[in-house]
Regions:
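An N-terminal hydrophobic leader/cap segment in hydrolases
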Residues: 2-60
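Conserved alpha/beta-hydrolase
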Residues: 89, 96-120
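Alpha/beta-hydrolase active-site loop
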Residues: 124-147
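Hydrolase active-site cap/lid region
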Residues: 167-212
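Short beta-strand/loop motif that positions the catalytic acidic residue
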Residues: 226-227, 232-235, 239
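Conserved alpha/beta-hydrolase "acid-adjacent" motif
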Residues: 240-246
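Catalytic histidine-centered segment of alpha/beta-hydrolase-like enzymes
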Residues: 265-275, 293, 297
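Post-His helix in hydrolase/transferase enzymes
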Residues: 271-286
Length: 300
C-alpha cells in the first residue's frame, strides 16, 4: 500500500473506524486492513513513453495472460525490467535505449492485475508479491536466461524472492527497494489508527494468504539464503515511499553490493533521471572483474 494512498485514507472515516475496531473487534479490523493491503492503487504519474513500443509477447500464468514487450536482437543477452506495486512494464523504459544501443536485449512485462495483463488469482485490482515473482519467473522461462534484472520498489522484493526459488541472474539492480515489509505494517497501523491487537492479526492474515512468513521477504536476511549476484542499489535520500535506509540495510547485508544515492528524485522520477539511467546501464554492461567491489554498505 503506497504512502500516497495511506495519506488519502487518513483523511477519511476509515481511520476512526479502525480505532474503534482496535478496541472492540480487532479481528474485524485486521480483515479490513488485509483488504487494503492487497489492493493495487490506480497507476500514478503515467507519462509519454521514452522508448518506441517493443515487440509484444504473451506468457500464460495461472491460466491467465501476462503481456510484455521485447526490444533488441533476439540473440543478445537479456535484461529484464520489473515494475513495482501499481506500476507497469514501460515505466522503466528509460533503460531500453542505452541497453539495446550497447547490444543487449530488453524485456519488460506487466505483472498480473497490472497494466494490460489479466487479473491474477486474487482478482481484478488485487495482487501479491508472489504473483510478481511468479510472473518474472514465467517471463524469464519464456524469453531466456537473465544477464541482469532491473527492479523497482516492491518489484525488487519479488525479484529477490524469485532468486530464492531458482531464478538465475548475472546481475541485479534494485531501485528504491523495501528492505523488510514487517516494519511497514507498523507504519500502516500508525497511519490508519489501529494498534497491536489489529496489527498482529493483520500479519497473521497476510502470512496465511501468501503461504509464507513475512520474514521470507526481508531482503537483508535473504543474503544468507539465496545466490547473490553483484547488486547495485539506487535510492533517493528524500524518497517518501521507501526510505533510503532500506537500501543501506540491504547493502550492508548483501555481498558484492554497492549503493548509489541521489537527492531530490523521489520514488518514481528516479526511474527517468539521466544520471541514474547511466549509472545502471554502466553497471549492467561492465565486465564482472572490471570494477573492484567495495565493502558492502559503501556508496558511490
Amino acid at each position: 500500500m503506497p504512502a500516497s494512498r495511506l495519506a488519502a485514507i487518513q483523511k477519511s472515516t476509515i481511520v476512526r473506524s479502525f480505532a474503534l475496531l482496535e478496541r472492540v473487534a480487532p479481528a474485524v479490523g485486521a480483515r479490513w486492513a488485509e483488504a487494503l493491503w492487497f489492493r493495487i492503487p490506480s497507476p500514478r504519474g503515467r507519462r509519454d513513453r521514452l522508448a518506441e513500443p517493443g515487440r509484444p509477447f504473451q506468457v500464460q500464468l495461472y491460466g491467465r495472460t501476462v503481456v510484455g514487450e521485447v526490444w533488441g536482437d533476439e540473440a543478445a543477452e537479456t535484461v529484464y525490467l520489473v515494475h513495482g506495486w501499481g506500476g507497469w512494464g514501460a515505466q522503466l523504459d528509460a533503460f531500453v535505449g542505452p541497453l539495446t544501443g550497447a547490444g543487449l536485449r530488453v524485456v519488460a512485462f506487466d505483472a498480473p492485475s497490472h497494466g494490460a495483463s489479466d487479473p491474477g488469482p486474487e482478482g481484478p485490482g488485487r495482487s501479491t508479491i508472489l504473483e510478481l515473482a511468479d510472473a518474472l519467473a514465467a517471463v524469464v522461462a519464456a524469453n531466456g536466461p537473465a544477464h541482469a534484472v532491473i527492479a523497482h520498489s516492491l518489484g525488487a522484493t519479488a525479484a529477490a524472492y524469485a532468486l530464492g526459488r531458482g531464478l538465475a541472474a548475472g546481475r541485479m539492480v534494485f531501485i528504491a527497494p523495501m528492505a523488510d515489509p514487517l516494519p511497514y505494517t507498523r507504519m500502516v497501523a500508525g497511519r490508519l489508527g489501529f494498534g497491536e491487537r489489529t496489527r498482529t492479526r493483520l500479519v497473521a492474515r497476510i502470512e496465511r494468504r501468501v503461504g509464507a512468513s513475512m520474514s521470507a521477504f526481508a531482503l537483508p536476511a535473504m543474503a544468507g539464503r539465496v545466490a547473490t549476484p553483484p547488486l547495485l542499489l539506487v535510492h533517493d535520500r528524500h524518497d517518501t515511499e521507501t526510505g533510503w535506509s532500506d537500501s543501506a540495510a540491504i547493502a550492508r547485508s548483501w555481498p558484492r553490493a554497492r549503493l548509489h544515492s541521489t537527492t531530490g528524485l523521489g520514488h518514481r522520477r528516479i526511474l527517468r533521471d539521466p544520471g541514474v539511467v547511466a549509472e545502471v546501464a554502466g553497471f549492467v554492461l561492465e565486465p564482472s572483474a572490471a570494477r573492484p567491489w567495495r565493502a558492502a554498505g559503501t556508496r558511490s
